[in-house]
Amino acid sequence: MRIVCISDTHDFHDEVVIPQGDILIHAGDCTGWGRMDQFKDFVDWFSGIHYKYKIFIAGNHDWCLFRSKEECVKLMNNIIYLEDESIEIEGLKIYGTPWQPEFCNWAWNLPRNSELLAEKIEKIPNDTNILITHAPPAGILDKTLEGESTGCELLLDKLNSLQQLKMHIFGHIHEDYGVKVEKNITFVNASICTRQYYPDNKPIVVEV
């Protein structure tokens, strides 16, 4: 199964060249400021990509989904939107959640290490094969240019329970784009935009 991963396109989706694959996954921040017109433009683009399966979760910039979920979901006719839920595709159990530790008072934020955030993280089923979050786990592809590790500690702890996990896809920290394999799990920071919000990074392809 060929998984193509993107994230943090921030209104620059038209400049992204999508390679062929079986499942296309966008790990959030499709918009710049979360406006409905920005989201509609993204959906038009994402819907038009010829893939058997296209999966999307929200990111902290995607205010329209946070405030007007029903209206947004109606637009996504051939897109699988995951918000604290799973889908099984050809034997792969895929779970998506947008929640992250508080970050600059954006959408989908909860206080770091809080009970509220822990409740969201604990919903991830232990038999998940592919996990999609917007923010990274602590210490994995989560460093800013200043060297600060900004990932989620609760998410890192949860990974110990996910014995069948093959991939974890996220974005959020643009400057730590890339792939890391640890304990037989492929971690993908799929941020398309750089720290300066230039869409210079390429989609990341992983065979599962």
Predicted regions and their residues:
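Active-site-proximal beta-strand elements of phosphoester/diester hydrolases
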Residues: M1-H10, A27, G91-Q100, N129-H134, ...
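Active-site-proximal segments of metal-dependent phosphoesterases and phosphodiesterases across multiple
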Residues: T31, M36, P101-C104, D127-Q164
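Binuclear metal-dependent phosphoesterase catalytic core
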Residues: S86-E90, D157-L162, M167, H174-V208
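Charged helix-capping and loop-helix junction motifs
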Residues: F39-V43, C72-I79, P111-L117, E146-L156
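Active-site-proximal loop/helix segments of hydrolase catalytic cores
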Residues: H10, V16-I18, A107-D127, T133, ...
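Core catalytic region of metal-dependent phosphoesterases/phosphodiesterases
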Residues: I6-I89, S161
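Catalytic metal-binding/acid-base residues of hydrolase active sites
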Residues: H10, C30-T31, N60-D62, P98-Q100, ...
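Short, Asp-centered acidic motifs that coordinate Mg2+ and/or phosphate
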Residues: I23, Y53-I55, T128-I130, K166-M167
